[in-house]
Amino acid sequence: MTVSAPAATRAAVAGMARERTGPRERALAFADFHIHTRFSRDSILSEEKFIRVALDRGLTHVAVTNHNNVEGAMAVRDKAAELGVDDRLTVILGEEVSTSDGEVVGIFLQRTIPRGLTAAETADEIRAQGGLVSVPHPFDPFRPSHIRREPLERLAEAGKIDLIEVFNSRVTFHRHNQEAAEFAARYEIPGIAASDSHSSFEIAMSFNAMPAFENVDELEAALAQNEWHGSRSTVLIHLTTRYAVWSNIVRGWLGKGTATEPILGPEAPAEVKAEPIEAPTPEELPDPGDPEASSDRG
């Protein structure tokens, strides 16, 4: 079941989520399966800022899907454990992979999948790690990095797609999300909503409410009862990715590492305290030739 709802809905859901204190007490999971942090060149969102905002807005499960690396997701997972909130925020290791056919997302990964493989090869690599294959923003014409129609159909016909984004907050026009929903229905692929957030403002713009899950099998079962809630980001949000790209380029030239958002904003739980964050060096980030990283359409 899918539900499109205004941003006000997430405030109500956040209030419901905050009533729970541990994973066993969660009757529902509130999940976002497509989020970027500073380990994507087009984001400056730090691990701690991300965790603060995600908890404040009521998310319980997040798939961190940086461009062409899982190290960013590992950094969020480790920071959540360090802050003592990993029992309240389940961090799923993910990656948005730049394939030769367009972007494919893998979640529940163990290690980075190399860029440049075909979409089918990438799907096989994701499955080999015990992960799930998700297709992000498949029909957004403003993002040349999206997967092309022919390889998308081949993946679907081969049964190699586990999830498809039927609502992506960064898709400008509703008809392109609707096209994704129709494609998912045609091939009977579970649909999800995703914020595709690259900044703290966007976190939980879209999310999925479903029975709580802790692993791939439980998620696949929970998807049958998923109710997704979607709100579109303003088109101006793409300026934040452009700012992030150029900030990181300039800081790289100056030898100052990567930029990060200030650790300010919504009040975090008492046990979450602001601490200095060591930013990765430019060499540790994905290749700036990444078409997604070099575009202002993140």
Tell me the role of every PLM-derived stretch.
Residues 2-53, 71-80, 86-87, 92-93, ...:
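Charged catalytic cores and adjacent phosphate/nucleic-acid-binding surfaces used
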Residues 50-71, 131-134:
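Divalent metal-dependent hydrolysis catalytic cores, especially in the metallo-beta-lactamase
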Residues 136-140:
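Acidic/Gly/His-enriched mid-domain segments of enzyme catalytic cores or analogous surface patches
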